[in-house]
């Protein structure tokens, strides 16, 4: 599906601070030129981590080379709360399952930048243009992301073109995201019940929404979605949650926090 969407240039989707450097590399992909641009940004103390990471990723894609000294940009950055190996493993798994866009959007900025550095430093890992676009594009414009994310704005296999308004739209996005991340649990995960409870809550919610759309329920979507949020909040308060470690813990925690904030706002 993603291949049917137009792939925009890197300079159209990157942050404003990285745009000039990325335009230079796009217009003149000569290795010497790109290498000079990368090293300037790598050593530029005034450049923030996100800007440098975006320049690094475009350099990696154009040159097909591991950026020299790429780990230097993490100097002084506290990344101890993340396990880079687990982070990259989950990303590779999301590529295989077609959920990489949702996975990246569920990470906070630091985790995403840390993952980018480790992806770019892996000589065995190739990057296509769509992957780089998904890493560097901003969250404010959903048209920059893959078709998988666009279709996640409504429940899968919905029997009609349902329009969700206000907070319902955000709740649906969170529902789809948390379900897809929960399906990516590691095979050796000890928190099996935790993940199963999440999937069960999401599946039951989809069934109820489908039934409502078909006129089989007397109550409305508000009741269904609020009930789902309450159930997710309850699941994350149980001891089983403590067994979810590594990137699964970080990602699901971020999404569950968004669920809790949305619930409080209603």
From Swiss-Prot:
Q: Does the keyword Signal apply?
A: no
User: Keywords in UniProt for this one?
Assistant: Viral matrix protein, Virion
Q: What is its main location?
A: virion
Q: Which InterPro entries match?
A: Mx/ML_C
Q: Which domain of life is it from?
A: Viruses
Presence of keyword DNA-binding: no
Q: Which residues form a coiled coil?
A: none
Offer one Pfam family short name for this entry: Mx_ML
In its UniProt record, a GO molecular function of this protein is: structural constituent of virion
Q: Where does it live in the cell?
A: Virion
Gene Ontology cellular component terms for the protein in this record: virion component
Which purpose does this protein serve, as stated in its record? plays a role in virion budding and release by presumably binding the ribonucleocapsid and the host membrane.
Output this protein's name. Answer: Matrix protein
């Amino acid at each position: 599906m993603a291949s049917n969407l137009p792939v925009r240039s890197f300079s159209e989707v990157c942050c404003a601070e990285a745009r000039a450097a990325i335009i230079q590399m796009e217009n003149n992909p000569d290795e010497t030129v790109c290498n000079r641009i990368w090293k300037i940004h790598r050593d530029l103390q005034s450049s923030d981590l996100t800007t440098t990471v975006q320049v690094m990723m475009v350099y990696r894609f154009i040159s097909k080379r591991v950026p020299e000294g790429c780990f230097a940009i993490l100097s002084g950055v506290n990344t101890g709360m993340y396990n880079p190996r687990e982070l990259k493993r989950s990303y590779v798994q999301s590529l295989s399952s077609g959920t990489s866009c949702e996975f990246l959007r569920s990470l906070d900025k630091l985790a995403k930048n840390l993952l980018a550095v480790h992806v770019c430093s892996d000589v065995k890992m190739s990057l296509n243009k769509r992957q780089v676009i998904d890493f560097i594009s901003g969250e404010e414009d959903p048209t920059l992301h893959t078709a998988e994310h666009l279709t996640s704005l409504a429940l899968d296999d919905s029997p009609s073109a349902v329009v969700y308004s206000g907070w319902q739209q955000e709740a649906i996005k969170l529902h789809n995201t948390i379900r897809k991340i929960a399906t990516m649990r590691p095979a050796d995960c000890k928190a099996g019940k935790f993940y199963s409870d999440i999937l069960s809550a999401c599946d039951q919610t989809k069934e109820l929404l489908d039934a409502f759309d078909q006129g089989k329920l007397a109550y409305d979507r508000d009741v269904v979605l609020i009930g789902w949020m309450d159930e997710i909040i309850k699941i994350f308060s149980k001891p089983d949650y403590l067994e979810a470690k590594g990137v699964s813990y970080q990602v699901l925690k971020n999404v569950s926090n968004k669920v809790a904030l949305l619930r409080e706002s209603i």
